[in-house]
C-alpha cells in the first residue's frame, strides 16, 4: 500500500486492455490465403468435428479461422475474408470466415439467416 506522498508523486497506473483480435490490426476484416484446412474436436462437454483452416493474412500473421455453416469448398491457396469473433468451444480459434466472399462460396438453398452465410435470395413463384 503506497503512502499518500508516494501516491501524489507517482499517481496510479492505467490498466491496459488486451486486444483479442490483434492480427486484424484494428481493421473490420482482412484478406488471407488458406495454408491448411482441417477439423478439430471441441472442449468438453461438446462433441463434433469443427471445420477450421490455418490462414496467412495479408499482414503476414498466421491464424486459425472457423468455417461456419454446413459444407464448404475451401482448399489450400484459397483466398478468403476474415472477421473477428471467437468460437467458444475451440481454444485458440478467434476468427471467422465470411461466406459468399472471394473463394469461399455461400450455402445454396439456405432460407433463414441468409446474410450470415452468403446465400442467394430464393426465387419467388
UniProtKB/Swiss-Prot annotation:
InterPro entries: NA-bd_OB-fold, Ribosomal_uS12, Ribosomal_uS12_bac
The entry's keywords: Mitochondrion, Ribonucleoprotein, Ribosomal protein
Lineage: Eukaryota, Viridiplantae, Streptophyta, Embryophyta, Tracheophyta
Molecular functions per Gene Ontology: structural constituent of ribosome
Annotated Basic residues bias: 9-19
Annotated gene: RPS12
SUPFAM superfamilies listed in its UniProt record: Nucleic acid-binding proteins
Stretches the record annotates as Disordered: 1-24
One Pfam family matching this protein: Ribosom_S12_S23
Gene Ontology CC terms, in alphabetical order: mitochondrion; small ribosomal subunit
Gene Ontology biological process: translation
Function: Protein S12 is involved in the translation initiation step.
Coiled coil region boundaries: none
Protein family per UniProt: Belongs to the universal ribosomal protein uS12 family.
Listed name of the protein: Small ribosomal subunit protein uS12m
Domain of life: Eukaryota
Localization annotation: Mitochondrion
